[in-house]
């Protein structure tokens, strides 16, 4: 059984047009949303075998706020996750070591939303699937589960959406 979770980075600051996309920081709203997700993780006792994050500053700041709720789980920052493409995201997932059962990825849209939709079984809980399809807001958290035993077997419609949580709901 594999568990694949995603967080879209929290709301970033667009006030400085001279800052590169990779170097944009979190806005105050993004910091608050990240704290809400951190509190949710603590309350729900969320655990992950591995955590991977994009190297973009807004993703790094998002996971650094959440980090205290992750106990001793190491966070690995991967340039490959600074992507907006679901094919690149799936390639990254397929290379995860098989002894890792539960993964959290902090990244970007549309890659996260498209990956979740692509991997999700369309005959499952349509409410969760419809919500993800409608919008994957900043700082939203989603978990997918599958009976596959190797990450390289990850493919279309092989996962079920277990939960989809937005900070505004908490």
Predicted segments — roles?
Residues 76, 82-84, 149-170:
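Functional cleft and adjacent loop/helix regions within the main domain
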Residues 81-98:
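Short phosphate-binding loop-to-helix
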Residues 11, 56-58, 110, 148, ...:
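Short, glycine/serine-rich, charged loops/turns that create anion-binding
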Residues 4, 102-104, 141:
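Residue-level preference for the first positions of well-ordered beta-strands
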Residues 123-162:
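Domain-level recognition of soluble alpha/beta enzyme cores
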